[in-house]
Amino acid sequence: MNKLILFLLLFICFSAIGQENKERQISVNKVGILFSKAKQNNLLFFDKDYDYKTNVYKFQLFYPIQKGESWDVNIILQPQFQKAQHQLLNEQFITPDEENFEFLREKFIQKKDISLYAFEVALQLRKSIIKNISFEATLGLGAGYISLESERLAKGFTFIENVSLGLAHKINKSEFFLATTVGHVSNFNIQKPNSGYNIFGFELGYRIFIK
């Protein structure tokens, strides 16, 4: 249900983009890079069954949709690469009724490196707080490919969902960005298993204005 809501939200956003395009030309006004470091076991999430940590590298293209009196609205296109590490901590998570359960326990209890390649579209709300400092709230949804299976998620096609809250500091023709982020990775029950991963962490970004 949560993914359906996100899909509808992004559909509305793209409809708005199409309408805006009829009235004026929309083009990129900023490009940026963003680094995020997040993990499963933290202040918000804790699961004794597994450990999951990830470093995320994003390239960002910012499209201004609306400039309002209170809030500005932007769409961000974000191709990205995620380098994660996963380990099963509680072997009882794999129950004896599963086929080859002993083999699977031995396989997933080993620490493994996982790669995730994804393309994400995000809706950003931005509000100026004081001169050159703005608050940003961003909601993103994307699709990608994850390189290895685990007891929680199948290898292959997957969805990513991200929410971030942070501050941007403008300096001349560039700006720095610092935020907290919450994310989820799963595959919408296209494959089994689909327990997914939850993460919480921090983001650091740098952007350059090109308009």
Predicted features along the sequence, with ranges:
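Outer-envelope beta-barrel architecture signal
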Residues: 4, 23-31, 69-75, 131-137, ...
